[in-house]
């Protein structure tokens, strides 16, 4: 006969699941890097990302000590630009020959842009960074809410016209970012494109057979496009998941909602 006995709470029991711990310090881990095999806690994930971004800044960012350098950082209130601005301030913000300005474009999307704009403002206040903004109306474009309302009429008048809001918003937003960079006489523009963004863009261009567009991808350190300030992408080798984890670890102000018109 098999003997059964009751296990009380006072008796030690073997854990059914062992939470992963950091390879470096033994604390609770937040990520396993599939590409490196490392398991890291929030603190050592931050150190890993900081090291990679610092290496990219040394490659992409050319600082002119004689006249100083103005870096314009395009932010949106989201995780990518929040991490980008935080790391740029951390890595080069103390230099006397560097001026950092952050800017955000208001697309005119009710219920989405106001809270994300506030996150951008809060982040800049926390970091002590100058903040500027512009809107589609200031650029003499329609607000995106109005653009979306008119899309059915546009498609009726022109069969070849795009009915995707992102097609219009992308063009307007790029012009807004360029206008902000020009406003502060920026020497360089920093964009928050991560590894996932870069890979997606390359694959889409390959699928469309658009090799020229792939060749024009940032960074443009040595060959600025259309006379604009060089564009740098310090986060281009950082996976989106790690950026999100770092933003949460540092409790950065960020807006989690997706654009209601995203497709």
Give the location of each predicted region.
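RNase H-like two-metal-ion nuclease catalytic core shared by retroviral integrases
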Residues: 247, 261-263
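Metal-dependent de-N-acetylase/amidase catalytic core
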Residues: 217-255
């Amino acid at each position: 006969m098999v003997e059964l006995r009751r296990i009380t709470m006072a008796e030690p029991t073997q854990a059914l699941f062992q939470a992963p711990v950091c390879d470096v310090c033994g604390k609770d881990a937040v990520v396993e890097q599939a590409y490196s095999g490392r398991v890291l806690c929030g603190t050592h994930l931050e150190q890993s990302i900081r090291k990679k971004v610092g290496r990219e800044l040394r490659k992409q960012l050319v600082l002119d000590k004689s006249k100083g350098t103005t870096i314009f950082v395009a932010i949106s209130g989201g995780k990518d630009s929040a991490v980008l601005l935080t790391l740029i301030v951390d890595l080069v913000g103390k230099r006397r020959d560097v001026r950092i300005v952050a800017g955000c474009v208001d697309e005119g999307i009710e219920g989405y842009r106001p809270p994300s704009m506030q996150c951008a403002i809060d982040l800049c206040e926390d970091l002590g960074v100058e903040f500027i903004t512009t809107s589609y109306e200031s650029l003499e474009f329609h607000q995106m809410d109005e653009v979306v309302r008119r899309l059915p009429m546009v498609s009726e008048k022109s069969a070849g016209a795009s009915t995707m809001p992102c097609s219009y918003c992308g063009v307007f937003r790029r012009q807004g970012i360029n206008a902000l960079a020009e406003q502060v006489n920026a020497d360089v523009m920093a964009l928050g494109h991560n590894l996932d963004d870069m890979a997606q863009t390359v694959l889409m261009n390959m699928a469309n057979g658009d090799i020229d567009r792939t060749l024009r991808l940032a960074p443009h350190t040595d060959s600025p496009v259309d006379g604009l300030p060089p564009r740098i992408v310090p986060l281009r080798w950082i996976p989106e998941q790690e950026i999100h984890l770092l933003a949460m670890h540092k409790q950065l102000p960020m807006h989690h909602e997706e654009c209601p018109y995203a497709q």
